Regions:
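Alpha-helical junction/boundary sensor with strong preference for TPR arrays
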Residues: 62-70, 122-130
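Acidic, Ser/Thr- and Gly/Pro-rich intrinsically disordered linkers and low-complexity segments
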Residues: 66-87, 132
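Residue signature of alpha-solenoid helical repeat architecture, marking inter-repeat boundaries
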Residues: 28-31, 85-86, 90-92, 137
Length: 148
């Protein structure tokens, strides 16, 4: 239980694979998938749920098709050694997790659960790295969250 709470509470401070240093001034015009995910984490940490929604929607619209293709075509298991080869998959999956957390914080539990289920079903192999470089799988965290 302590580990589960630690993982869930610590997720807000993690940064997506290949993340860039986030500036204080979040510019939604970013077109790099990892930058969008990083900025979405920053917005979530700041409690800016409207910006989380905008950034995650932009990520889905611009990179969703590529993420689906990467998930389907990744005949190999994605691991920490090759995770950076799948930036769209990692960013879209991570953005789903961020969006679910934002929805939960706003009290939209049913939407949160639906978003977590979509992450588990559509992007089970996405990876994310924390600031220390340790990888975790948002889909696994989503499964734990749904089991609560």
């Amino acid at each position: 239980m302590v580990l589960k709470n630690f993982i869930l509470s610590g997720l807000v401070s993690v940064v997506c694979v290949g993340s860039l240093q986030a500036a204080e001034d979040v510019d939604i015009a970013a077109t790099d998938p990892t930058e969008l995910a990083t900025k979405a984490w920053v917005a979530l940490k700041a409690g800016d749920h409207e910006l989380v929604s905008e950034l995650t929607t932009q990520c889905f619209e611009e990179f969703g098709d590529d993420a689906v293709r990467q998930q389907k075509e990744s005949g190999e298991e994605i691991s920490k050694e090759n995770a950076s080869s799948f930036p769209e998959l990692n960013s879209v999956g991570t953005c789903l997790f961020i969006l679910a957390e934002s929805l939960s914080q706003q009290g939209y539990d049913e939407k949160c659960q639906a978003t977590l289920k979509k992450l588990i079903t559509d992007f089970p192999e996405c990876h994310c790295a924390n600031k220390q470089g340790y990888y975790w799988k948002p889909a696994m965290a989503a499964e734990k969250r749904l089991a609560e």
